Amino acid sequence: MLKILVSNDDGVMAKGIQTLAKALRQRYDVQIVAPDRNRSAASNSLTIDRPLRKQRHENGDIAIVEGTPTDCVYLGVNHLVRPRPDIVVSGINHGPNLGDDVLYSGTVAAATEGRFLGLPAIAVSLDGETHFDTAAQVTCDVLAMLQRVPLRAGNILNINVPDIPLAEIKGFRITRCGSRHASQHVYTQTDPKGNTLYWIGPPGEKNDVGPDTDFAAVDAGYVSITPLHVDSTAYKALELLKDWLNKAEVEKTC
């Protein structure tokens, strides 16, 4: 039986992860290892300045106290889940992870850590906070497809699901990441002692929403599947940079 490590960034008790785990447990061996609280936008942060503790809930779920999503997958794969899991599934996130969101997302980061540790990995997000059952069934369907036809590309699958009933889903689309306009909102408040408090504002509005993007697919009622990879090298820029370096070295004056 496939052994799945399930994590997220919304916290171990979040509706998304609990709905997902309930659906997956009907077919697979599932172990939740997730933050004990909301750690949204934690990205790939790893805790190295203090020790971490675990809490095991009555149902067997494991919460990592003050841990990040990356901490949870690191500990789960390397120590807590035995035998070692076959795959990491992160989600269901409460809200989308489209376009530039993947840079900040703790949901995507948990999947990235799984892939970095050598496992297949899926991140699942719902474009809203209502139809978690839809996203759970979509995840089960994708896992079934992966078992029938294993994917050898070695990528992370970033899945975004429209927040609609399952019967209204039009199908799947393979997409690229779109983009948002840069977020510039900062909200300020003053505490009782007169100190200024700062709140980071919401993400920017959609920018690149071309027909092959994740934004376009979800807006049209399709499940978006975007392949992501751990290697951040900009390969197309390598030759350009080599030429630049050669010219810069020739023309340098000091």
Swiss-Prot record:
From which residue to which does the signal peptide run? Answer: none
Its principal location? cytoplasm
Say which domain of life the source belongs to: Bacteria
Q: Which top-level enzyme class is recorded in the Swiss-Prot or TrEMBL entry?
A: hydrolase
Binding, a divalent metal cation: D9, D10, S40, N93
Family to which this protein belongs:
Belongs to the SurE nucleotidase family.
Cofactor dependency: a divalent metal cation
What's in the keyword line of the UniProt record? Cytoplasm, Hydrolase, Metal-binding, Nucleotide-binding
- Any Gene Ontology CC annotation: cytoplasm
| Its job | Nucleotidase with a broad substrate specificity as it can dephosphorylate various ribo- and deoxyribonucleoside 5'-monophosphates and ribonucleoside 3'-monophosphates with highest affinity to 3'-AMP. Also hydrolyzes polyphosphate (exopolyphosphatase activity) with the preference for short-chain-length substrates (P20-25). Might be involved in the regulation of dNTP and NTP pools, and in the turnover of 3'-mononucleotides produced by numerous intracellular RNases (T1, T2, and F) during the degradation of various RNAs.
The record's catalysed reaction(s) read: a ribonucleoside 5'-phosphate + H2O = a ribonucleoside + phosphate; a ribonucleoside 3'-phosphate + H2O = a ribonucleoside + phosphate; [phosphate](n) + H2O = [phosphate](n-1) + phosphate + H(+)
GO molecular function term, any single one: metal ion binding
Q: Where in the cell is it found?
A: Cytoplasm
What name does this protein carry? 5'/3'-nucleotidase SurE
- Which NCBIfam families did the record assign? PRK00346.1-1 (NF001488), PRK00346.1-3 (NF001489), PRK00346.1-4 (NF001490), surE (TIGR00087)
